[in-house]
A protein has these predicted regions:
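Extended catalytic core of nucleotide-activated donor transferases of GT-like folds
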Residues: 6-10, 56, 64-141
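C-terminal "capping" alpha-helix adjacent to the active site of nucleotide-linked donor transferases
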Residues: 282-303
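Aromatic "clamp/platform" in nucleotide-sugar-dependent glycosyltransferases that forms part
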Residues: 242
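Short acidic/histidine- and often glycine-rich active-site loop of Leloir-type glycosyltransferases
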Residues: 265-279
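Conserved catalytic-core segment of nucleotide-activated headgroup transferases in glycan assembly
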Residues: 37-40, 153-227
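Short hydrophobic beta-strand element within catalytic cores of glycosyltransferases
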Residues: 259-262
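A charged, aromatic-enriched C-terminal amphipathic alpha-helix characteristic of glycosyltransferases
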Residues: 298-354
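A short, glycine/small-residue-rich beta-strand->loop->alpha-helix junction that serves as a flexible
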Residues: 28-40
Length: 358
């Protein structure tokens, strides 16, 4: 029995060193809607496959609706596997990446031999399925990947430093770029809650009936490249997401040279400043602020300082920067897993494993 365990560990170490293992990214079924958090998971999987790792998308049901085609070129080659198919095989040398919302999946996978890591993109979802009084550490999880330093600090403090978090910021694809055509009197709007969108445009048309020819465009559910093209032709982007911790949509707008008018979220994004957007803490004022900006746009008198501050952000959060962080952080996680497995070997076996590695 002891020899079997030794052989298993040595085999797992060898496979990790040779990249002969799988990284499963568990995702929710968005029914084909391309939401930013799931798109970011696909980006991690795509980059890891480019680096030679066997990254796969893991979902619960056989009838999962993939979003790969809506993300653009390079995503449709990512393999998908469902739990329902009963074809999932997980080994000691494999990894499962679980979004923060799925505490139930963390509990269900607690006895699997693989390394499990939580992917925190929205701190507000941490408690969604977490049983009161329970911690991720109760399910054997102590490692987290997140998207910002603020969220890293929040998670580590929340779990009393028993969780170690690594930061890989979100990237904004290159197809988010300024349009070569004049902007249209269209306001692109993205809200987490559909009711916020309805309240904003109804209040706007009620308060300013002379601007009824201005169009509001709901940006949710569009394929990514269509989303980017539609955003770039707008004269203004409106963003309401109180529990956002990163702010992907406003960054996409800024990269497209479209000013953002938004409600400051509870966890203020690290990139946000008083001068790089039209920010407010009062949701009631959003319709009035839209009208004020629209009047300035018609008169070609938008604040130039706003555009200058937007320019400073345009080179940030690139795909190249994210790829570097993915390479670094996942490489670190894999090496730590190797060391963890070696620590479970007797001394003579550790020396043997080190000699094999050399």
């Amino acid at each position: 029995m002891e020899n079997d365990i030794k052989n298993l560990i040595e085999e797992s170490v060898s496979k990790l060193e040779k990249k002969d293992f799988k990284i499963f990214f568990f995702v929710m079924d968005t029914k084909g809607n391309t939401i930013a958090s799931v798109a970011n998971i696909y980006e991690h999987a795509k980059v890891l496959r480019e680096l030679g790792y066997d990254a796969q998308i893991l979902h619960e049901k056989n009838d999962y609706t993939p979003i790969a085609e809506s993300l653009g070129e390079g995503y449709s080659d990512i393999p998908h596997v469902s739990i329902e198919s009963q074809q999932l095989k997980v080994n000691t040398h494999d990894f499962i990446i679980i979004p923060e919302i799925f505490a139930n999946v963390m509990e269900q996978t607690a006895k699997l031999p693989s390394k499990r890591i939580v992917f925190v993109q929205s701190y507000d979802y941490i408690f969604e399925m977490l049983v009161p009084g329970k911690s991720w550490t109760d399910y054997g999880i102590r490692d987290v990947i997140t998207t910002s330093e603020k969220q890293k600090e929040y998670v580590e403090n929340l779990f009393s430093k028993r969780i170690k978090a690594e930061v890989i910021p979100v990237s904004i694809p290159k197809y988010f770029k300024p349009s070569d055509k004049p902007k249209k009197p269209i306001i692109s709007i993205y809200t987490r809650d559909q009711r916020d969108l309805v309240k904003i445009y109804k209040a706007f048309y009620l308060r300013f009936p002379h601007l009824k020819w201005v169009s509001f465009r709901d940006m949710r559910g569009l394929p990514r490249e269509t989303f980017a093209k539609s955003l770039a032709e707008s004269c203004l982007a409106v963003w309401v997401d109180r529990v956002s911790s990163f702010g992907t949509f406003p960054l996409e707008a800024i990269k497209s040279d479209v000013p953002v008018l938004g409600l400051v979220p509870d966890m203020v994004p690290e990139w946000m400043s008083d001068k790089n957007g039209l920010w407010t803490h009062d949701p009631v004022m959003i319709a009035d602020l839209i009208a004020n900006y629209f009047q300035a746009w018609l008169e070609d008198s938008e604040p130039q300082e706003l555009y200058e501050e937007m320019t400073k952000l345009k080179e940030s959060y690139s795909c190249e920067e994210q790829k570097e962080k993915i390479t670094e952080i996942y490489g670190k996680i894999i090496q730590e897993r190797i060391e963890e497995l070696k620590s479970n070997l007797p001394v003579e076996n550790v020396e043997l494993a080190n000699n094999i590695e050399q």
